[in-house]
Each structure stands twice: as structure tokens, then as C-alpha cells.
Amino acid sequence: MEAFPPTVLPNIAYWNVTNGTWEYQVQVSWPLNWTTRDADSSVETLYVLDGNALAQTATEAFRKRRPVEFGQPDAIVVSIGYPNLQPDSPYSDGRYYDYQMPVCDTCPPQQDAPGVPSGGEAFITFLDTVLRPWVHDYFPNAAFQRDGLYGHSFGGLFVLYALFTRPDLFDVFLSASPYLVWNEEYFFSEHSPLFNNDTAVGNATTKPALQLSYGGLEQAPRKRRTETQEEYETRRGFLAALKMEDLCTRLYDQIKGSALLRDVELNVYPFSYHAAVGGNALADGIDYFLDW
């Protein structure tokens, strides 16, 4: 038996990391032109949620972009996944804890994952005080510049929670198909961090930017050739109830003039469903991340 050559997964490493509650599978990738982790270079860093599903997508998107984007800066991708996954799925039950924002003390408990408490605050602390310093130590000579955070679906909702709770945490926030219907649209309630943010973020050059994305077929799907009418109506009813287009548009309209943000962009994929947006918005979001 012969081991794979280093060209199979070059400049990629994996670790299991714990915050004391959950164990994470962290994948870190760095530029192909680096022959050592001690490279002396300025770098941008993108942190990606649901790493089991999206780590390679993010890594390859940066690498495929490099040959045709001559001015692309060096970038490191830090993807946060889990070692234990749901059956036949790239997702873990841990995400329902880590990505879940807290609700007010007098609010009824959320019913999307009954009995699972909020771990959003603890996860922000983990990203900021454990994972990011560790990444900086792993590349001792890198000059770290800007950081971005990407999340899709429930991860996209966490990105919004992090943005309005800790706008200083990342320079660019990328939220794809955020699960805004969660807990009876709690994010639009008077208790949401959307309306309760007193964080001062300094002058315009330090304010974060937000790209919000969704697919045009998420709320209004087309009938598939192989579907019966009954199957289509069932699927259509389920997707319509998620109100992806309505809620993303509503959020964009509410925050597009916000003094908290230096830029807000709404990116619509007219022919994409929910799952496809996860990869599309990540690859396209690189442009926004590097530009803003």
C-alpha cells in the first residue's frame, strides 16, 4: 500500500479542538505557493461554518480563482466542523447549539431544536479567544490583515447574530440563505440584537460589511420533471413556509442604510435552491470579502 503524494491535499491540515463543551474538526488551508507555514506574507482569513460540508468548497474556490485574478492576496481558510455527524449527512447536531442565538428571559423557548440550549455566545468567545489566536500562532510570520465569516442556513443566521452582537469581530460577514424564520422570526422581534445593539465600532473604515444571499427558487420552486403534482405541492408548501425571499428582502430593507455597516449587498441567485446557494454564495462571496 502506497501513501498518497502530498499533491492530493496540499497545504491543508486538520485538528480536533475542544471548547470544553463540544469537539470541533478544524480544517486550515493556506496558499499553494507557500512551501512552509513560516512564510512571511500578508494574508486575509476567511472563517467558514459547517466545515464538513463547505471546507473544501472554500479552499478550492480561493485556489481556482488565483490563476485568473492576478491581484488576489494570499488567503487562509479556517473551516469549523465536527467529528461526529448525523447519519448520511455532512452536518452535526452541535450546530444547533453553537449557532443558536439566545432569546430573552421572558420569551418562550425555541421549538426548532427542542431542549437544545443556546450556545451562540460561547461559540463567539471560542472563535475570538481560542481559535483565532491559535491560527495566528500556527502561521508565526504571517501579517494577518482582514477576517471574514461565512455561514449558510442556520449558520447564516448565526453570522447575522454575530454581526449585530459583535460587529467588531470580523471585517466582512457573509450570510447565505439565513434561517430567518427560526423561532417565529425572532430575529425581527423587539428583543433581537437587530434592534438592541449599542456597540460602538469607531469610524467608517472599521465598520463591517455584509453580503446577504439567497436563491430565487428557495421560496418559489419549480415543478421537477420527475415529480408528481402531489409531491411538488408538498415540497412547494414546505419551502414557501420558510419565506426565504420575503425575510431576506425584509432584512435588507431594514439595514441597507444602517450606520453600523460600511456596506450592505443583497445577492440573489435566481435559479438556485437552498443547498446550491451554500456553495455558490461562498465562491462568489470571496470577491466581496476581498473587495470590501
Where are these regions (language model features)?
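Non-catalytic cap/lid and distal C-terminal segments of serine-dependent acyl enzymes
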Residues: 1-292
